[in-house]
Design a protein with these regions (language model features):
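The substrate-binding groove and active-site-proximal loops of carbohydrate-active enzymes
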Residues: 1-7
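Active-site-proximal substrate-binding groove within the catalytic cores of carbohydrate-active enzymes
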Residues: 8-143
């Protein structure tokens, strides 16, 4: 198994050497199999495959303990049957890390689509600061 992993990493290094601007997300089974050999190579690491925005908040709040903020991909899934608060919650979860926008965006109401757009525009205004940011947990890790 170790030889297989090393062969894969060697192949991956060759891909990134040939295509240095290539961006590939490391899913790692929704972040469950994250390892530092992969983190050293991939610019994006999925933190979870979770779709429930209420539970994803804890994942987003703690992701900085294992990943750099600019590398930690936080999924934002506004649900087609959700409301405005759910849409806002989804966007806020992802703002301080790296937004992975998903869901049935074309099926959202105009108001909810505008909230997603506003969240992404705000994210674009702060994303250069994210890579210099340091995570802080004044009350300990979120539970």
């Amino acid at each position: 198994m170790l030889e297989h992993e090393r062969a894969y990493l060697k192949w991956l290094d060759g891909v990134f050497e040939k295509y240095p601007e290539l961006v590939i997300e490391n899913c790692s089974s929704g972040g469950l199999r994250t390892d530092y050999a992969m983190l050293a190579r991939y610019s994006i690491q999925s933190t979870s495959d979770h779709e429930d925005y209420r539970n994803y908040a804890t994942i987003a709040a703690n992701a900085g303990a294992a990943l750099t903020p600019e590398q930690a991909a936080i999924w934002s899934y506004p649900l087609k049957d959700g409301d405005e608060e759910e849409t806002i919650y989804n966007m806020v979860n992802a703002l301080l890390l790296r937004i992975h926008q998903s869901g049935h965006l074309a099926q959202l109401s105009k108001e909810r689509h505008a909230l997603v757009k506003e969240g992404i525009e705000y994210y674009k205004s702060i994303r250069q600061d994210i890579k210099k940011a340091l995570p802080v947990w004044p009350n300990g890790f979120a539970t």
